[in-house]
A protein has these predicted regions:
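Conserved helix-turn-beta segment of the N-terminal RecA-like "Helicase ATP-binding" lobe
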Residues: 95, 345-370, 379-382, 468
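Conserved pre-motif I regulatory segment
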Residues: 262-310
Length: 468
């Protein structure tokens, strides 16, 4: 009996062991065996301070000796751990080839638990532990997480398993897990056909899946996991976006790039009028002297264009960026950042959306008390918000910078842009920082974020939109 089958014999579909948590001997009596390893490393000197290990037979190891650890692992086939590939194994073995298959619970967690609430044992990229600086305890938690991951893998459809295996077998962060569960790619059906069938109606039918799979296999796997969530507030962890920034590009290609020939997904989910009715209850956009300025601006934003829009006062300009923001909040779990000059205007827009039952908007400004500010920041970080209103001065805040780096920002909107269209005594120099911030953001994340600039115009001759 394989290790995989023995594990499944003791784990039910929800991830709970059918025997006691510490009794795992029933599936470890054959030649296949495994151990969990955790290494504590000094923050300053980057040297190993402590080593802990937990073997399949419940034997434990806890001392700072690599030689003794190797003896402890002498009959092991799989060495498991949380971030073991790029942390523990590097400090223990360096770049030397090991005979063990490394099973990393870190990289599988967002793939198998992409939806809120996320796995209880994982926060960001860290494993939640009961004790500080106790590597044996960390091994126990990693074992619990791995068992849950295996149980969830078993619950996936055979087609989904083939998709993930086809994308990830041979990639060191995932290969050990794939070996442990005996995953196999499907040789009978093409990967493109499998993905199109598994995610029918959730992605563009004409997306170039083949190219994405060849160039970005890991990013495609994470993107597909997120796409399958039912809670749009679920977001890709910041550490995944840091290591695989292509996730944002891939999910946009699958979910928010309108195909030329049209398909069921694009014709409905990316249609401006359908979503206007869905979110705001309107049957049509406003027109000005017969010209559909509002619809033109909204459609340009939905299609991923940077644009300049000039509207008469009271012309409904806010809807031209709110509607695309709500659409992208659902399609790519994205965040739109609205830079507005007045805190009262920010509050009015958030309140007006809330009156319509739309709770996706939040503002962070200096008028908030510490508790309200903390709650607002948490809503942005957690994915509750798809619209964030801030002043230009807030872009200099390290807190704002941190939370924006952790989210998939799809667009920056400069609202009430007439505030910096001319010099004057009350000119706010922080408006000059907006361009620098956006450029640095794009460079650090390796993405192209779109921009909308919205002006008030006093006369109809000034009203219109331009694409940039």
């Amino acid at each position: 009996m394989s290790l995989w089958n023995r594990i499944l014999d003791t784990i039910n579909i929800g991830g709970a062991s059918s025997s006691s948590d510490n009794d795992i001997s029933s599936f470890t009596r054959d030649a296949d065996s495994y151990a969990f390893v955790d290494v504590e490393v000094g923050v300053k000197n980057h040297k190993i301070q402590d080593i802990g290990a937990l073997r399949h037979d419940e034997a434990t190891f806890h001392r700072n000796s690599k030689a003794d650890l190797l003896d402890f692992l002498s009959d092991i086939d799989f060495v498991c751990g949380h971030n073991i590939v790029h942390h523990d194994a590097k400090f223990l073995f360096g770049d030397k080839r090991q005979r063990w298959a490394l099973v990393d619970t870190l990289y599988m967690s967002p793939l198998l638990f992409p939806e809120r609430p996320y796995h209880r044992l994982v926060k960001d990229d860290k494993l939640m532990s009961d004790e500080i600086n106790n590597p044996v305890n960390d091994c126990e938690k990693a074992r619990e997480l791995l068992f849950d991951e295996i149980a969830h893998w078993r619950s996936l459809s055979e087609r989904r398993q083939h998709i993930y295996a086809s994308l990830l077998i041979g990639i060191e962060e995932f290969d050990g897990f794939m070996q442990m569960v005996g995953a196999e790619s499907n040789a009978n059906d093409s990967l493109v056909e499998l993905i199109q069938a598994e995610f029918y109606g959730k992605i563009c039918a004409n997306a170039d899946i083949k190219t994405l799979a060849v160039k970005y296999p890991c990013a495609l796997a994470y993107a597909l996991a997120l796409i399958d969530t039912t809670d749009q507030r679920s977001v890709t962890p910041a550490w995944v976006l840091y290591n695989y920034p292509e996730v944002e590009y891939v999910i946009r290609q699958l979910r928010h790039t309108r195909c030329a020939v049209g398909c069921e997904y694009c014709d409905r989910q990316l249609d401006a009028r359908y979503n206007l009715k869905r979110f705001f209850g309107y049957d049509s956009f406003r027109t000005y002297d017969g010209e559909p300025l509002q619809e033109n601006a909204a459609c340009a934003a939905i299609d991923g264009k940077s644009l300049l829009a000039i509207f008469p006062t009271g012309g409904g300009k806010s809807l031209t960026f709110q509607l695309p923001a709500l659409i992208e909040g659902g399609s790519v779990h994205g965040l739109t950042v609205v830079i507005s000059p007045l805190q009262s205007l920010m509050k009015d827009q958030v309140d007006n959306l809330a009156d319509r039952g739309i709770t996706d908007a939040v503002t962070i400004n200096g008028l908030l008390d510490p508790i309200s500010r903390s709650l607002a920041i948490e809503r942005v970080q957690s994915g509750d918000a798809s619209l964030l209103y801030i002043s230009p001065e807030m872009l200099r805040s390290k807190t704002i910078e941190k939370i924006l780096m952790a989210r998939h920002v799809v667009r920056f909107v400069i609202d009430e842009a007439h505030c910096f269209s001319a010099w004057g005594q009350d000119f706010r120099v922080d408006y000059l920082y907006i361009g620098k911030f956006i450029k640095e953001y794009q460079e650090r994340k390796g993405v192209d974020t779109h921009t909308s600039v919205v002006f008030h115009g006093d006369g109809k001759a000034e009203s219109g939109s331009r694409y940039m």
